[in-house]
């Protein structure tokens, strides 16, 4: 009797193709806001990102989805996680990746962002990833270039790919996003992460709470469709996910908190406060963390409850999904 051949090993790359075949085109040529996505589009994007997670865990991590395309990273603010993950994402998809630093650009010589955009557009990059200290910078750039622009953070406005990776982390931990309660805690006022997460989590069916001191809460935040809490323990009571935010001292021009010690006492996440959340609650932080200010190390480093390292891994997969989807749209339009 002839022995049966062993089953072919699972190839994560093959799981990507059918998703790409049914993938939506982005509602716009650019990805500037988490609000650009409706629920089916967001779900498709998470499905694609999920396939890239499996792909990234194999030994060979090379695809040709962006072969012949040029990805340019324009980071006018410091970044470790976001810039590195976009660079890795682009290279794994086969793109030529160019990193531009403001320290070596003509911006230091007085060139405006618009002039920079016009100059870069003459080089015909296909995809431009932009981080800038000014709200609306990515939108402005998108009006001046022929390639697709991805907002990697514009001032206090938005950080849409962070919201995608956060939603992916939550979905992988719970198997769903819809019906969950997510408490976003801390410096909401200065947080582009909070704004993008509120938009995407609502789209995916989650209930969102904002928790923080009155001095760090946007005026009329309830208009975002959230509940606002100034008491940390009450705000995270029964929450499935507790998402901590970095205290952005560099964006503060006054005394928003008495001291970091006092801030941790009332709004830093420790075991005692976390006990108020749901029994199987998960903890998140977009990074970089200020340990002992926003979150206790004992909580941040506990693999049973913390998704913080998962968020870093999901960042590459989520950004691969965004880049691949935009490339799909470029092909549809013959670019």
From Swiss-Prot:
It catalyses: carbamoyl phosphate + L-aspartate = N-carbamoyl-L-aspartate + phosphate + H(+). The keyword Phosphoprotein does not apply. GO terms for molecular function: amino acid binding; aspartate carbamoyltransferase activity. Keywords: Pyrimidine biosynthesis, Transferase. L-aspartate binds at residues 109, 192, 246. Its EC number is 2.1.3.2. GO terms for biological process: 'de novo' pyrimidine nucleobase biosynthetic process; 'de novo' UMP biosynthetic process; amino acid metabolic process. One of its GO terms (cellular component) is cytosol. Pathway: Pyrimidine metabolism; UMP biosynthesis via de novo pathway; (S)-dihydroorotate from bicarbonate: step 2/3. It comes from the Bacteria. PANTHER family: ASPARTATE CARBAMOYLTRANSFERASE, ORNITHINE CARBAMOYLTRANSFERASE, MITOCHONDRIAL. Catalyzes the condensation of carbamoyl phosphate and aspartate to form carbamoyl aspartate and inorganic phosphate, the committed step in the de novo pyrimidine nucleotide biosynthesis pathway. This is Aspartate carbamoyltransferase catalytic subunit. It comes from Caulobacter sp. (strain K31). The gene is pyrB.
